[in-house]
Amino acid sequence: RSFFYPLRFFFCEGPQCALPLVALNYHNVEIRIHWATAASNYNVECFANYYYLDNEERGQVASRKHDLLITQVQKNIASGTLVQELTFNHPVKYLASSDTTTDGALTSPTNKVKLNINGLDVSNYKWGKPHFIDVTSYYHTNFVTSPDFFLYCFCLSTSSLQPTGTLNFSRVSSATIMSESMNINDPIYAVNYNILRVEN
C-alpha cells in the first residue's frame, strides 16, 4: 500500500516558485521533517522535481540576484481564555484554525467571535459557523477539505501566489481575536508573505 502527500512549501506552488539551486551552489538546502512515533512503521521517501537549464541559462541564473516572494506559516499558542492575542509579523494574507470537535470556540455554531485591531473592532461579534467557515471558504478559497476550518481572510484569494490583500502585522500595535462565550483552546496560524533574497 502506498500514499502520496504533497509537501506544501512555497517553492512547491509552481515552476515560477522553484528554488534557484544553481545560485545556491555553495549552500545546502535541507528539508527536515519530524514524524510522530507511529511513522516508524512506514518506509518514507521524498521526491523532488527539477528544471534543467542549458549552460547559458545556468550562468545567467547563477550570476544574478533573485528576490523570491515566499509564504511562511506562523503559529500562536492557544490562550485558553476568551481573548487570544495575535503576535504575528509581516504582511499576513489569512488567519486559520481548525477543530474537528463541536466545542471549538472559533468553529462553533453556538459561539460568536470578532477581530480587534489596535483597539478597534473590525466588525461586531459573528457566529463562528457560518461566517468564518462557510462564507469565507466560499468567497476566498478554491476548496477547503475540512468542514471545521476557521478562516479570517485579508486577501481576495487564499490560493493566489501573488498578493491580493494583506494586513501588515509588523505595523499593528495590537491584534486580538475575541470569543463571546467559549475559551479559545486551539492554536491560530497565520500565512504571511516575505522576501527571500538569493545573491552571490
Language model features with spans:
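Flexible assembly/topogenesis modules
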Residues: 1-200
